[in-house]
Amino acid sequence: MVTSPFARWQREIAEEVNEPFTPDQAPLFRAVLLHQETHCIFILSSHHAVCDGSSRIFLLRDILLALSGHALEALPLAPSRENLFGAQQRTSTEPGLPSFAAQRPLLPRVEGVKLTPQQTMALQGRAREEGVTIHAAISAALTIAGRAIDENWRNSPLRIMSPAEIRNILGLKDQCMVSVVGGEIFIASGGSMTFWELARFAKDGLSAVKSRENISRKIDLHCTAVSSNLTVEQAFQLKRNVFNAQVMFTNLGRLPFDSTFGPLKLETLWAPCALRGIEGEQTLGAVTVNGSLHLTHTSPAPIPGLLAGIEEELRKACAI
């Protein structure tokens, strides 16, 4: 618990993101409370083997329900994504390393901005008119802003890793588990697409991510990698090949429950904040709370002005 009224949530989140979990020491979960007289901040972090970003949002809901006097029942252990999808689940046939010394990365920088409810509504309306998702619109803003600032982004193909929620496909509601599948938007260097043309391109690039064929293929690839008893070097190369996108962008969508819990109210939510251990990586998180779109940027080597640039591109595209 941190009781200092001057504690900054950005610094605390950065330290949590930078603190590794020991895989064989449960629980693979941590919680931090920044407490003040009339406000408090919960920071929930976990190993990705335990749950995903949506799960942590539901856990935060349960914490607020408990604090407001609701009795909560214990839930059964959720089956794995593989079991729910009916896919063959394979594991390694050799024990893992007893320890592995990895160099600690630089402390990341975390920052956030939020649009007003009016600006968020304008963005939603314009995206609907253009036939694209909010995720696609933010991806376009991210691309334009990043390439305006960073020469490497301008002169190289841009890969945007975009994890997609598949709870509805798996028949899930608020279970605490991993229920995402990987997607990626690939944008060649150069080009002269307008903002909304770029947004439509991004939407098309993710159109098949939630198909049963793609989910099955992704699960099979993951299981094959795990069951092949990779060496440390092989695992490192696999991570570089699969997760080496310049940016990971996760949109958790609209808060799936009311933000008022008796005398308590959830005012803001900055999520998700995660790192992959890739050189130069940028992570963008998005979630809409109380009608306001919240954007969070996390990186050990942040592109200066990226988040402000994204906000500005969204404003220009929607005339807000």
Where are these regions (language model features)?
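Non-catalytic, low-complexity flexible loops and terminal extensions
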Residues: 38, 50-125, 313-320
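Structural preference for long, well-ordered alpha-helical segments in enzyme cores
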Residues: 12-13, 42-46, 55-67, 119-127, ...
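Acyl-thioester-dependent condensation/acyltransferase catalytic cores
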Residues: 1-54, 61, 65-68
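Phosphate/oxyanion-binding loops and surfaces in catalytic or ligand/nucleic-acid-binding neighborhoods
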Residues: 49, 62-70, 205, 209-212, ...
